[in-house]
């Protein structure tokens, strides 16, 4: 330690460490995105690594606002399955920003990668305010979400055409028994070859 850091209070040192951790994670995320930006497809392993960095970064920014989990079936070889680059991350971003952030008490995003038959499912499940309420909020325009979902569906359709993957996208508006929104579930399905 330098003499200057000796004179800093523990609180100031803690803030400095948080800032360094945040910038380190941010730089890793930017580097990963730039490395993958010119690629049409990447391994699911690389896509998940990007998603983990993004979620970790947002968690650092909003520590008390949301929690997250990644649950990955260890029998899936993530390095063999190719997916369109940055196909999962936008749905995690939507879950955090449009589902959970508007909730006073915050929420949780669960990312699950699992196998069913010869498919691999990537599930982004949040307990946020739901798409209907999100669209009604003044800070959110209808066209923003529909464009993002439409663009992602177009990318999946193009990837299916080029690579004959038979990937699909399903968005489920979760509701309780009273019909009130309990969040959103996005399921991306990829054929495992």
Report the location of each language-model feature.
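Two-component histidine phosphotransfer core
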Residues: 1-168, 172, 178
């Amino acid at each position: 330690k330098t003499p200057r850091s000796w004179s800093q209070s523990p609180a100031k040192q803690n803030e400095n460490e948080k800032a360094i951790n945040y910038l380190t994670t941010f730089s890793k995320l930017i580097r990963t995105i730039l490395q993958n930006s010119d690629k049409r497809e990447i391994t699911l392993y690389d896509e998940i690594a990007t998603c983990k960095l993004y979620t970790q970064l947002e968690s650092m920014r909003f520590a008390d606002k949301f929690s997250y989990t990644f649950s990955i079936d260890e029998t899936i070889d993530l390095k063999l399955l190719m997916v369109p680059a940055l196909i999962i991350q936008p749905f995690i971003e939507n879950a955090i920003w449009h589902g959970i952030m508007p909730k006073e008490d915050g929420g949780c995003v669960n990312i699950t990668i699992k196998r069913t038959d010869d498919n691999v499912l990537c599930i982004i499940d949040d307990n946020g305010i739901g798409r209907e309420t999100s669209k009604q909020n003044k800070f959110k325009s209808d066209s923003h979400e529909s464009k993002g979902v439409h663009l992602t569906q177009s990318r999946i359709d193009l990837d299916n055409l080029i690579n004959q993957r038979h990937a699909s996208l399903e968005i489920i508006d979760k509701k309780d028994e009273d019909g009130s929104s309990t969040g959103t579930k996005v399921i991306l399905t990829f054929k495992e070859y």
